[in-house]
């Protein structure tokens, strides 16, 4: 039980550090966490945490490149329907386009990428509110389109 609480404390501290928007490298984050008493933290652990929480590098108010957490627009949980974030799904002969609520495209794209080739998705490119999906096989794009639509309970 103590290990879980310690992990929860680490996550809270990690998020608080990123909210400061002043750490431009993973080694700076490691040093900050070590200063907070997490002596066993290392760069690979920080790298995994940055990836897990979707941290990105962006410019802060001083125009410095720093790590920060994406804006939490009611970050979906396992219980909240992602389908509410998908506004439109369309396609042509070679690509599927998904339109999302602002800020949701990267989250949805990550989900689609995790499904991958078995469901006909070769890869995705996500902006703020638009995702381009490249199907594994353009001759089966309708099947991939149906898969994407069914994932989000999207009906025309």
From Swiss-Prot:
<dbReference type="InterPro" id="IPR036388">
    <property type="entry name" value="WH-like_DNA-bd_sf"/>
</dbReference>
<keyword id="KW-0678">Repressor</keyword>
<dbReference type="GO" id="GO:0006526">
    <property type="term" value="P:L-arginine biosynthetic process"/>
</dbReference>
<dbReference type="InterPro" id="IPR020899">
    <property type="entry name" value="Arg_repress_C"/>
</dbReference>
<keyword id="KW-0805">Transcription regulation</keyword>
<dbReference type="InterPro" id="IPR020900">
    <property type="entry name" value="Arg_repress_DNA-bd"/>
</dbReference>
<keyword id="KW-0963">Cytoplasm</keyword>
<dbReference type="InterPro" id="IPR036251">
    <property type="entry name" value="Arg_repress_C_sf"/>
</dbReference>
<dbReference type="GO" id="GO:0003700">
    <property type="term" value="F:DNA-binding transcription factor activity"/>
</dbReference>
<dbReference type="GO" id="GO:0051259">
    <property type="term" value="P:protein complex oligomerization"/>
</dbReference>
<dbReference type="GO" id="GO:0003677">
    <property type="term" value="F:DNA binding"/>
</dbReference>
<dbReference type="Pfam" id="PF02863">
    <property type="entry name" value="Arg_repressor_C"/>
</dbReference>
<keyword id="KW-0055">Arginine biosynthesis</keyword>
<comment type="similarity">
    <text>Belongs to the ArgR family.</text>
</comment>
<keyword id="KW-0804">Transcription</keyword>
<protein>
    <recommendedName>
        <fullName>Arginine repressor</fullName>
    </recommendedName>
</protein>
<dbReference type="Pfam" id="PF01316">
    <property type="entry name" value="Arg_repressor"/>
</dbReference>
<dbReference type="GO" id="GO:1900079">
    <property type="term" value="P:regulation of arginine biosynthetic process"/>
</dbReference>
<dbReference type="InterPro" id="IPR036390">
    <property type="entry name" value="WH_DNA-bd_sf"/>
</dbReference>
<dbReference type="GO" id="GO:0005737">
    <property type="term" value="C:cytoplasm"/>
</dbReference>
<comment type="pathway">
    <text>Amino-acid biosynthesis; L-arginine biosynthesis [regulation].</text>
</comment>
<keyword id="KW-0238">DNA-binding</keyword>
<dbReference type="InterPro" id="IPR001669">
    <property type="entry name" value="Arg_repress"/>
</dbReference>
<dbReference type="GO" id="GO:0034618">
    <property type="term" value="F:arginine binding"/>
</dbReference>
<comment type="function">
    <text>Regulates arginine biosynthesis genes.</text>
</comment>
<keyword id="KW-0028">Amino-acid biosynthesis</keyword>
């Amino acid at each position: 039980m103590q290990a879980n609480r310690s992990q929860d404390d680490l996550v809270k501290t990690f998020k608080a550090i990123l909210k400061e928007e002043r750490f431009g490298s993973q080694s700076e984050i490691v040093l900050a966490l070590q200063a907070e008493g997490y002596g066993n933290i290392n760069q690979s652990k920080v790298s995994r945490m940055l990836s897990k929480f979707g941290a990105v590098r962006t410019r802060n108010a001083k125009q410095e490149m720093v790590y920060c957490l994406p804006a939490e627009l009611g970050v979906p949980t396992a219980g909240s329907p992602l389908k509410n974030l998908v506004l439109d799904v369309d396609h042509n002969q070679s690509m599927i386009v998904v339109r999302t609520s602002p800020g949701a495209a990267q989250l949805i794209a990550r989900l689609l990428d995790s499904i991958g080739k078995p469901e006909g998705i070769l890869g995705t490119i996500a902006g703020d509110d638009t995702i381009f999906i490249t199907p594994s096989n353009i001759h089966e794009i309708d099947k991939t389109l149906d898969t994407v639509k069914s994932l989000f309970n999207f009906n025309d």
